[in-house]
Regions:
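C-terminal motif of bacterial Sec signal peptides marking the signal peptidase cleavage site
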Residues: 23-25
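Short acidic-aromatic linear motifs embedded in glycine-rich loops, typified by GG[WY][YF]DAGD(H)
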Residues: 27-160, 169-177, 184, 191-192, ...
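Bacterial N-terminal signal peptides that target proteins for export
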Residues: 2-13
Length: 488
């Protein structure tokens, strides 16, 4: 054993000595950094193409601010809704529902990435996204002074950068209050940021947007859709005026926008008619509100209402960002929490290959397969649409008759195994129900939905309905969700 140990000690020493000799044999220049490329901002942003590249990122971020967080459970837009009177979090299987606002309404409350299924809001996402937008706008403003170009063109770039910065700060101050005001890129690492009063920030943004309104061109004078135009600048300036109490100036800008900028309300149907995912189960009567909210019609010349559009279509490689509105904001009604009086599950998301499939009850394609991360409030469903305490039946934005608005009671049981197959679902049982053994199964007045938070509410279908092109083409698919890869 002793000889065995000595043998391996000798080998180890020899290996160590050999390695040491090899290392000392290398010259110190071997350790000198030799990067193949260097990122030098002064060089990259010294041309118009460099400035264009940053502006393109600003435009894309503006779209991503609401469209997606790369998550199948969460998009940013409903977090804004939850701090209004319109929506509340509704995923009852999560550990929290933003119930402790003092803890959760902070920019650093939840710094996990967007794929964390336990998240209930996008508060940190807004903080990060908005300050990234501020940084990119400041990049343009910091370097454009040394870029050789016509002064008029230079002022257009400055005006668009001002818009992007002002838009982010308009969001930040109303989401978080007093925040740090950054108007240039930091030259050294900095951690001692201090907040600036909200009103001071708003007044600075007003001055910037007054400049932008002068120099940014109208959409009709631009080659591309999706970039900042004069109408968008004027709209943001009017909002900023109102935020500091300058209501007269705000009205002046809005009068110009409405009467002298080529925009007008759409009063008749126009563009392409999308009949919905399944026109038999959920028919749509064509109307101007439905047409106005279709992605196919948003950016066409016939649409006189759009002030600034943000294209989001095609494939992911073309910068398309999925927006699963029908998954995230529609009721989770395809499970056994909603029953018929005989105790059978009321609604199933059958595939078209299933023997129990009936086109007239195909609500999965008509309305999507929701999981209800967020839901509409009672105010949004009812009170908002009342005029003098009476429901306005003529408002197309709340019209169930045209298919624009989804009421749960409009759905019919699509379970062939139920005695109530083809009958409308009800929140409460209308009569006692006895089975074939004369046993009482359901009493009159019993609740037919055991989770009304997540599974029983109305939806503004005309807003959130998106064509799920890829999944719609698959006969075996049972989960339409919204705009997926390849959508318009």
């Amino acid at each position: 054993m002793k000889n065995y140990i000595q043998k391996y000690i000798c080998k180890s020493v020899a290996l160590f000595v050999g390695t040491s000799l090899m290392l000392t044999g290398c010259s110190e220049s071997f350790l000198d950094p030799d990067p193949q490329t260097m990122f030098e901002p002064e060089t990259v942003f010294s041309t118009e193409n460099g400035i264009k590249s940053v502006l393109a990122i600003c435009d894309r971020q503006l779209k991503r601010n609401y469209v997606s967080e790369d998550s199948r459970e969460m998009i940013a837009l409903p977090t804004e809704y939850t701090f209004s009177d319109l929506m509340v979090p509704s995923a009852t299987d999560k550990s929290g529902l933003l119930d402790n606002v003092d803890n959760l309404l902070r920019p650093n409350s939840d710094q996990t990435n967007e794929k964390n299924l336990g998240r209930t809001n996008s508060i940190y996402f807004f903080w990060r996204q908005n300050f990234e937008g501020v940084r990119n706008a400041n990049t343009i403003l910091s370097f454009i002074g040394n870029v050789p170009m016509d002064e008029t063109l230079k002022n257009e770039y400055i005006g668009r950068a001002y818009f992007h910065r002002a838009y982010r700060y308009y969001s930040l101050v109303f989401q978080f209050g007093h925040v740090p005001l950054l108007t240039k890129l930091p030259e050294v690492p900095k951690q001692n940021y201090r907040s600036t009063h909200r009103d001071a920030i708003l007044k600075k943004m007003v001055a910037d947007m007054e400049f932008a309104v002068q120099w940014v061109p109208e959409q009709k004078d631009m080659d591309y859709v999706g970039m900042v135009n004069k109408g968008a600048c004027r709209m943001l300036l009017s909002k900023l005026y109102m935020s500091i109490g300058e209501f007269g100036k705000a009205k002046e800008q809005l009068d110009i926008l409405i009467d002298k900028s080529g925009y007008s309300l759409m009063k008749e149907s126009f563009g392409t008619f999308f009949e919905g995912g399944e026109s038999v189960s959920w028919p749509i009567t064509r109307n101007v509100i439905w047409d106005l909210h279709r992605p196919e019609n948003k950016l066409i010349a016939a649409n006189k209402e759009v002030i600034m559009g943000m294209p989001n279509r095609g494939a992911a490689k073309e910068s398309f960002i999925p927006m699963l509105t029908m998954r995230i904001m529609y009721p989770f009604f395809f499970d056994n929490r909603i029953k018929m009086p005989d105790g059978k599950q009321a609604l199933f998301n059958y595939t078209r290959k299933d023997g129990k499939y009936r086109k007239e009850y195909d609500y999965m394609r008509g309305l999507g397969r929701g999981i209800s991360t967020f839901r509409t409030t009672t105010f949004y469903q009812d009170d908002l649409w009342a005029v003098n305490d009476k429901m306005d039946q003529t408002d197309l934005r709340h019209s169930a008759e045209t298919g624009n608005w989804m009421h749960m009671e409009k759905l019919k049981c699509n379970n062939p195994d139920s005695e109530f197959f083809g009958q409308n679902i009800k929140l409460y049982a209308e009569d006692d129900y006895y089975n074939e053994k004369n046993e009482l199964v359901t009493r009159k007045g019993d609740l037919m939905c055991s989770d009304t938070i997540r599974r029983w509410y109305d939806v503004p279908h005309y807003i959130f309905c998106l064509n799920d092109v890829i999944n719609q083409a698959k006969e075996t698919n049972n989960g339409l969700e919204g705009a997926t890869d390849g959508s318009i």
